[in-house]
Amino acid sequence: MCITSLKNQKEFELINKLGQKFYERYFILVIAKKLPKIFLESKYNTFLGIKVSRKLNKKAVVRNKIKRRIRHLMRIIVNDSSVKAIKFAIIIIPRKGFEEINFSHLNYELSKIILRNI
C-alpha cells in the first residue's frame, strides 16, 4: 500500500493552502498535486487526511465507520495503475448524507473527481 495519513494540524493546513477544493453533494475534496519538500522526501505516494466532524453524527461509531469507508475507497482508487506513480495529497470532508449513500455511488463520485484532477 502506498497511502499514509496526514498526521498533524500543520500538514492539514499546508494541504488546505496548496490544494484545489472540489465541492460535491456528499463530500468536499482538497487535492494538492504540488507537494512541499517534506512530502516529496517520503516513500509514500498518497497522503490522506479525513475530517469527520461531530456535526455530521454525534456517535463515534458512525464517524469511525465513515472513516473506514473513505480509507477503503482510497485504497481502491490508488491501486488503479494510472494513480500509483503520482504523488499527491488529499483531504476528504464528508457532508450530511454520506453515511446513507451507496458505496458504489461513492466510489464512482470520488474516483471521477480524483482521476480527472490528478
Swiss-Prot record:
GO molecular function, one term: ribonuclease P activity
EC number: 3.1.26.5
Xref: SUPFAM superfamilies: Ribosomal protein S5 domain 2-like (SSF54211)
PROSITE patterns attached to this UniProt entry: RIBONUCLEASE_P
Gene Ontology, cellular component aspect: ribonuclease P complex
Catalytic activity entry: Endonucleolytic cleavage of RNA, removing 5'-extranucleotides from tRNA precursor
GO BP terms, alphabetized: tRNA 5'-leader removal
Subunit structure, as described in the record: Consists of a catalytic RNA component (M1 or rnpB) and a protein subunit.
PANTHER family the UniProt entry points to: RIBONUCLEASE P PROTEIN COMPONENT
HAMAP family registered for this protein in UniProt: RNase_P
Family: Belongs to the RnpA family.
Protein role: RNaseP catalyzes the removal of the 5'-leader sequence from pre-tRNA to produce the mature 5'-terminus. It can also cleave other RNA substrates such as 4.5S RNA. The protein component plays an auxiliary but essential role in vivo by binding to the 5'-leader sequence and broadening the substrate specificity of the ribozyme.
Name recorded for this polypeptide: Ribonuclease P protein component
